[in-house]
């Protein structure tokens, strides 16, 4: 019987990644970024968080670590890495960023850019 588990290279090849493209944010829409952290191991996995039920927005939701872009963030990738460090203690230097996915508009008025990276 064939092993149905994906190896890391096979897993990554299923993502259609884009190089970061400079773009102007849409009018009246705040920018946010999330890290899609792929855990490096024989059978790769994704790290997700669960937001506190006491949060004002998105309470109790399962999500990737991330959040709004700050003025101190040079790029969307920098924002995703900063938020991942703040939320789940992933040091930015330990993330191998492999690309970004197209931005998604959230129901709360953010344009969210997923940043895909491999973590130890």
Swiss-Prot record:
Keyword tags: Hydrolase, Magnesium, Manganese, Metal-binding
Classification via Gene3D superfamilies: Nucleoside Triphosphate Pyrophosphohydrolase
Residues annotated as transmembrane: none
InterPro entries given in the database record: CoAse, NUDIX_hydrolase-like_dom_sf, NUDIX_hydrolase_dom, NUDIX_hydrolase_NudL_CS
Required co-factors: Mn(2+); Mg(2+)
Enzyme Commission numbers on file: 3.6.1.-
Alphabetical GO biological process terms: nucleoside diphosphate metabolic process
GO MF term list: coenzyme A diphosphatase activity; magnesium ion binding; manganese ion binding
Domain of life assignment: Bacteria
Keyword Metal-binding tagged: yes
Binding site residues for Mg(2+): 83, 87
Protein name: Uncharacterized Nudix hydrolase NudL
Gene name tied to this protein: nudL
